[in-house]
């Protein structure tokens, strides 16, 4: 599966989607689903990594705000995918769970959440899901 993740870049995304459907038609739905999951996980991880790099290289306050908003947006995309458990592998979900908790509990991002909470709805839905799971345990 790692080889499949490495093979995907933005330039051949359409080819990757075509391959998913070909795999589903020829071999099995599970193989195609795993392939699509790997593609989605790769794209989500790339968007987080890119936002982190932009945040690290930001020089002005406006660049930092923009990079932070991009990072939160990337984490929000992960949360939306997390809500649809069939998309992400268990290991991928576990690796980002603590990060999402830290984001919601950190005062650093409160300003962004207050300015446009609808942009980060996925983060809040996943956070509520975690809280409810803790109460039930």
Placement of each model-derived feature along the sequence:
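Membrane-embedded hydrophobic alpha-helical segments
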Residues: 1-39
């Amino acid at each position: 599966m790692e080889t499949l993740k490495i093979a995907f870049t933005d330039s051949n995304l359409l080819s990757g989607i075509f391959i998913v459907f070909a795999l589903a038609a020829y071999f099995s739905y599970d193989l195609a689903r795993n392939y699509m999951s790997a593609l989605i996980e790769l794209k989500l991880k790339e968007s987080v990594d890119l936002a982190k790099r932009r945040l690290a290289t930001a020089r002005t306050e406006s660049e930092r705000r923009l990079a932070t908003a991009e990072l939160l947006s990337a984490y929000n995309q992960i949360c939306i995918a997390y809500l649809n458990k069939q998309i992400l592998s268990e290991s991928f979900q576990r690796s980002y769970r603590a990060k999402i908790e830290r984001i919601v509990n950190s005062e650093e991002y409160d300003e962004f959440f207050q300015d446009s909470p609808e942009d980060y709805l996925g983060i809040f839905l996943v956070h509520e899901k975690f809280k409810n799971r803790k109460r039930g345990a």
